[in-house]
């Protein structure tokens, strides 16, 4: 038994399922999860001392790589001044100014402590501002675990939502409408059915929780137009894509202006953090300037602000995003080339520092229903093969992969050579 396996058995005695977030349990791929002891650059090291090239990056935040010296130094300097004050700090002001400078649609921003808190608060604000109850989300898009967001259409995209997790009252679920990602007709049908009741659309501009699905041309623009037509707000959930797809997020990359934006992951530099911001007219509706209540004991935590500021400043380096995109393209297209070489059907998607691959004969994946038809057994086999080769991918066929600036030529080469060997063994076993 490895030390990771022993720790997992020990953890299951005191922690539900042995983990503090379900995907970490490896249920999607089988086997026992790795327990991580440390990380540096492009590598993580498990409890048994084995190194892995990491394409999870703490699920997105580590865009500069693990244990980046500028972030580490900023955190250590902040720690000397105290861990939390429960009062305003200059760091919060600096972070707000940095976010606003990088994302043109954001005129004011409120810091919180998680992505879930950000989306939950943005939706409450949208409901309060519009005085409407219903929200519209998309099948396969994840926006955190707030009750109103853990909802999926029960018998099709145009039906009232049904709870997708026990513990969510149907009275909550009925206000959440679910449309089909990359399908404007499904959105218009809902607006025509509830023309004055929908407060907002919330969307992952690049869906990263059904693997990696970019928007088709015109989709985000169509959502913006429909929100304007029916008086709803457009919330772009950039918890995952913010400052990862481009310096101004996915909204900057695709040229779409939302009313509200949610952020997280990258803006914390690896610390727990979230934020929501947007038009001043809307943001002024939040307490203490407006009637919509939102608060948080650790919001704007000085350690998180210090880490986030250090990372955000580093991301302003000229040419960084072009280099990151080139690395991502090389990995995604390299996986596809290796699969083609061995006669294993595969489709790929990638944008900025995000990528996805699908074991499927479908040429292009643009919707959630297509993702569910992909070969999960092939993914599991590939996953464990790559893990044995020292490459750590997301342990689920429904999660995106992430590159960092710490992934260099050697890491990319080693990863693609490993993929070639694993896919070759898979073909030989078929």
From Swiss-Prot:
Its EC number is 5.4.3.8. One of its GO terms (cellular component) is cytoplasm. Keywords: Cytoplasm, Isomerase, Porphyrin biosynthesis, Pyridoxal phosphate. NCBIfam families: hemL, PRK00062.1. This is Glutamate-1-semialdehyde 2,1-aminomutase. It comes from the Bacteria. InterPro entries: 4pyrrol_synth_GluAld_NH2Trfase, Aminotrans_3, Aminotrans_3_PPA_site, PyrdxlP-dep_Trfase, PyrdxlP-dep_Trfase_major, PyrdxlP-dep_Trfase_small. GO terms for molecular function: glutamate-1-semialdehyde 2,1-aminomutase activity; pyridoxal phosphate binding; transaminase activity. The modification N6-(pyridoxal phosphate)lysine is found at residue 265. SUPFAM superfamilies: PLP-dependent transferases. CDD domains: OAT_like (cd00610). It comes from Shewanella sp. (strain ANA-3). GO terms for biological process: protoporphyrinogen IX biosynthetic process. Homodimer. Its cofactor is pyridoxal 5'-phosphate. It catalyses: (S)-4-amino-5-oxopentanoate = 5-aminolevulinate. It is found in: Cytoplasm. It is an enzyme of class 5 (isomerase). HAMAP family: HemL_aminotrans_3. Pathway: Porphyrin-containing compound metabolism; protoporphyrin-IX biosynthesis; 5-aminolevulinate from L-glutamyl-tRNA(Glu): step 2/2.
